[in-house]
Amino acid sequence: MVKRDFIRNIILALLAIVIFILLGIFVFSTFEIHKEAENAYLKNGDLVTIRRNIKPKYKDFVVYRVDDKDYVSRVIASAGQSATSMDDILYINNQVVDEPYIEKTKNDFLTTSPMGSLFTEDFNITTISKGNNKVIPSGKYLLLNDNRQNKNDSREFGLID
């Protein structure tokens, strides 16, 4: 009886380990926030859990890879949408978008910068896609950092898969 319980417990433990490993490979992963990716919500050194193989939504943070380096940015627009930033105002489908999540960083930047400085340089989907698109194509996303002075996002890399 004791031997059977011991074997059952070993099998259950091994099964739990295998399930945990499979979840880590296919469903969840962890990511450490680095200095360039920090913002009002994510700080340098924070360890976050990310879900794999899901379709991100507007305002979600996503981890993506470009040239074997990982980056964290926020989803601003997705397939079928147009996006323009002009004079520090973001427009999605020609509608002004409120971005309260960047206000503190933006205000800090503007109070320490020369008059007339822009927190977000002007762009649109045509400039980001090098003239190829006016709206975001299927399967692509416009990703921006909350700290818009850090241009390691769609403005540098183009639209992200």
Task: Name the predicted role of every residue range.
Residues 2, 6-11, 40-161:
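Soluble "head" domains of membrane/secretory-pathway proteins
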Residues 9-26:
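Hydrophobic membrane-insertion alpha-helices, especially the h-region
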Residues 21-39:
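Aromatic-capped interface at the extracytoplasmic side
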